[in-house]
A protein has these predicted regions:
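A beta-strand edge to alpha-helix "cap/lid" segment located at domain peripheries
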Residues: 2-25, 86-207, 264-354
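Short acidic-aromatic low-complexity motifs
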Residues: 9, 13-60, 192-238
C-alpha cells in the first residue's frame, strides 16, 4: 500500500461526500508512519481530510488529546469529537512553523509538528497561539495524538464589555508518568566538556565542540540539564531562540541566559515527569512531560501538561520551545500548590520579558 493508493481507494468510495461521524474503520492502513503523514497531507482530500484522519486512529487503545477539550479514546469517540469541532473552526489555519520531524521510537515511529493558528476573518489574518502535535504510529494505525498549546488567550476577552468565549474548563486529564531514569547517558566527550566548563566563566562564545547527540544528552540529563548556566552555554550566541508561552520569545544566548538564570530559580520545587520517551533524530529532540509541584508534606500536584522541542545545528542548540497551557496556572488551586512548592514567580517577572 502506498499513500497515493490509499487516497485513491478512499476517494473512489467517498469523493464529494461530507465527513460523517457514523463510520468505523477496522482494517489498518498498512502504511508506515511517513505514509500516514503523507496521506493526511494529500491536497486531494480537502475538507475530507478530517474523516481520513479519524479513519487512521486505532479502533481501541488510541487517544486524541486537545488542550481545550481534553482526551478522547478510541476511533469512534475521536471521530465524534474531531469532525464537528474542527468544522466549527474552519476559519482557522494551522501554519507550519518548521518541517515535520520524524523519530524512530522503536515501535513504529513518532512525528512532531509545530504550528501556529491563524484566524482568517474578513480577509484579515489574526495570529493566534503556537502549538505542537505529537503523533505515535503503530502497525498501520495512529495510536496517540496530543495537541499542546496555550488556551489562555482563548479564555479571555480583549474587550472588557464582551464576555470571554464559552469554553470547557481546562482538562484534568490523568497522565501515566514513566519511571524516572537517566535515559540519556553522557558520553566521554560530554563529561569532559562538563568537567572543563566547571573551571571556566559563564560566557560561551565558541562552539562547545560537541556532537548534536552530546548536546541532546546534556540538556536532557537529570542533573546537568537542570543547570541553567550549562543550558545557556549550549545556545548559539546569536542565532538561537527560546519560546515560552508565559514569557514570550527570547533570541540570542545572552537574552536566553538572563531569563533562565533569573526565572528558573523562582519556580520552586518542581519535577518534570516524562509521559513519553525522550526522542532524538540527529537534528531535533522531543520530550512530553507533566510539570509536578513537590509539596513540603511529600505530596505532589500535577500542574501543566507540556511538550518540549529542541533543534540543533552546527554544534549548538539553535531552537528551544516549551509548549504548555497557561490556563491551569490561573487556577487558584494550582497557584496555591505552586506557592506551597516554593514558587515566587510574580506578574512582574512575566512583564519584564514579554
Amino acid at each position: 500500500m502506498t499513500p497515493d493508493t490509499y487516497v485513491d481507494q478512499y476517494l473512489a468510495q467517498r469523493a464529494g461526500q461530507a465527513p460523517t461521524v457514523d463510520r468505523l474503520v477496522t482494517t489498518p492502513s498498512n502504511l508506515d508512519a511517513q505514509g500516514m503523514l503523507d496521506v493526511i497531507a494529500d491536497p486531494r482530500l480537502g475538507p475530507q481530510v478530517l474523516e481520513v484522519l479519524a479513519d487512521l486512529f486505532r479502533p481501541e487503545g488510541s487517544i486524541y488529546y486537545d488542550a481545550i477539550y481534553g482526551d478522547y479514546h478510541g476511533q469512534a469517540d475521536i471521530r465524534a469529537w474531531l469532525i464537528p469541532t474542527m468544522a466549527l473552526i474552519d476559519f482557522v489555519e494551522f501554519v507550519p512553523q518548521a518541517t515535520t520531524e520524524m523519530f524512530d521510537d522503536g515501535e513504529g515511529g513518532t512525528s512532531v509538528d509545530e504550528w501556529q493558528m491563524v484566524a482568517v476573518l474578513d480577509g484579515e489574518r489574526i495570529p493566534l497561539p503556537k502549538g505542537v502535535s505529537v503523533r505515535r504510529y503503530r502497525d498501520g494505525w495512529i495510536t496517540w495524538n496530543v495537541d499542546v498549546y496555550d488556551t489562555g488567550p482563548f479564555r479571555t476577552s480583549p474587550d472588557p464589555d464582551t464576555p470571554p468565549p464559552d469554553l470547557p474548563p481546562w482538562p484534568r486529564t490523568t497522565w501515566d508518568a514513566l519511571p524516572a531514569s537517566d535515559d540519556t547517558p553522557l558520553s566521554a566527550s560530554a563529561r569532559a566538556w562538563l568537567d572543563d566548563r566547571s573551571e571556566q566563566s559563564e560566557t560561551a562564545t565558541e562552539p562547545p565542540g560537541l556532537s548534536h547527540e552530546d548536546l541532546h544528552s546534556i540538556v536532557h540529563h537529570p542533573i546537568a540539564g537542570q543547570n541553567m548556566g550549562i543550558v545557556a552555554d549550549l545556545m548559539h550566541p546569536t542565532d538561537s531562540r527560546y519560546i515560552d508561552p508565559l514569557f514570550g520569545e527570547l533570541e540570542g544566548q545572552a537574552a536566553i541566559r538572563r531569563w533562565l538564570l533569573d526565572v528558573m530559580p523562582k519556580v520552586g520545587a518542581m519535577r518534570f515527569d516524562p509521559v513519553g520517551p525522550t526522542l532524538f533524530n540527529g537534528r531535533a529532540s522531543v520530550q512530553e512531560w507533566v510539570q509536578t509541584a513537590l509539596l513540603p508534606d511529600g505530596s505532589t500536584v500535577p500542574l501543566v501538561r507540556g511538550t518540549s522541542v529542541r533543534r540543533f545545528a552546527d554544534g549548538w542548540i539553535v531552537y528551544a520551545a516549551d509548549y504548555f497551557d497557561t490556563a491551569p496556572l490561573a487556577d487558584p488551586q494550582m497557584q496555591q500548590a505552586a506557592r506551597a512548592a516554593g514558587s515566587t514567580l510574580a506578574a512582574a517577572d512575566i512583564e519584564r520579558y514579554r
